[in-house]
Amino acid sequence: MAVKIRLKRMGAKKSPFYRIVVADSRSPRDGRFIETIGTYNPLTEPAEIKINEELALKWLQNGAKPSDTVRNLLSKQGILEKFHNLKYGK
């Protein structure tokens, strides 16, 4: 099972709000998911990003691949750097 960390769109029409979820890559964008690890609200100024760091690191270590947008959000929060240091032992 190929697992991805990606955005699940929530909210009303023209006012999107996203949940950052871990899901099987074959399931639909807003469909079935395994676990929610955070939220992202692009409408606030600045954009509000809340990510559970422990869960994100756990899933990255288990081989989950983040989507491009989630990769950018994780690096803004410093989580990808911590994952890199854990993986390569710095």
Swiss-Prot record:
Any Pfam family: Ribosomal_S16
GO cellular component: cytoplasm; small ribosomal subunit
Keywords: Ribonucleoprotein, Ribosomal protein
Organism domain of life: Bacteria
Gene3D superfamilies, per database record: 3.30.1320.10
Swiss-Prot/TrEMBL GO biological process terms: translation
Coiled-coil residue spans: none
Single Gene Ontology MF annotation: structural constituent of ribosome
Hydrolase as UniProt keyword: no
HAMAP family per UniProt: Ribosomal_bS16
Protein family according to the UniProt entry: Belongs to the bacterial ribosomal protein bS16 family.
Protein name, entry field: Small ribosomal subunit protein bS16
Name of encoding gene: rpsP
